[in-house]
Amino acid sequence: MLDAATYTPRLKAAYAETIRAAMKEEFGYKNDMMIPRLDKIVLNIGAGAEAVKDSKKAKSAQDDLSAIAGQRAVITKAKKSIAGFRVREDMPLGAKVTLRGDRMYEFLDRLITIAMPRIRDFRGVKGSAFDGRGNYALGLKEHIVFPEINFDKVDEVWGMDIIICTTAASDAEAKALLKHFNMPFNS
């Protein structure tokens, strides 16, 4: 059994032992605090039209996202009414969760080593999906690629957004950091 007091996630240990030194050498940082690190990972499931018709769909998305993240997700609600979409203010539309610390490193490890290889016809993620400030966004068409989701008990297959926020000053630094974490970029 793992001792919670001494356990360190695999990617967090790799960052401390090898990735920091490699990044410092690659970019010539003068100060250790200049070295980019992961800040947070935000997961989002938008239930969309299904949630408008049935409010239980947002609760289902929340339960699935909580299982994937390992911490409770919050239900996202509409900020304002839009008559064309039949959406009313405060209507539940999906779920989101923000991961930091050890849970963030554990999720990134599961995403890269378990979930991405399970995606059909997977050829890597786009290397151009950075926002100009060192953050990376990717989308999955099916949330069932995560082992925490029991395929037989899923009533709806959701797409999900994953935003990886770093402290990097540029996209090149953030891409190098994620490459050191073995993110499978296709370009």
From Swiss-Prot:
Signal peptide range: none
InterPro entries: Ribosomal_uL5, Ribosomal_uL5_bac-type, Ribosomal_uL5_C, Ribosomal_uL5_CS, Ribosomal_uL5_dom_sf, Ribosomal_uL5_N
Tagged with keyword Cell inner membrane: no
Domain of life: Bacteria
HAMAP family noted in UniProt: Ribosomal_uL5_B
Oligomer status and interactors: Part of the 50S ribosomal subunit; part of the 5S rRNA/L5/L18/L25 subcomplex. Contacts the 5S rRNA and the P site tRNA. Forms a bridge to the 30S subunit in the 70S ribosome.
Protein name (Swiss-Prot/TrEMBL): Large ribosomal subunit protein uL5
Organism ancestry: Bacteria, Pseudomonadati, Pseudomonadota, Alphaproteobacteria, Rhodobacterales
Gene: rplE
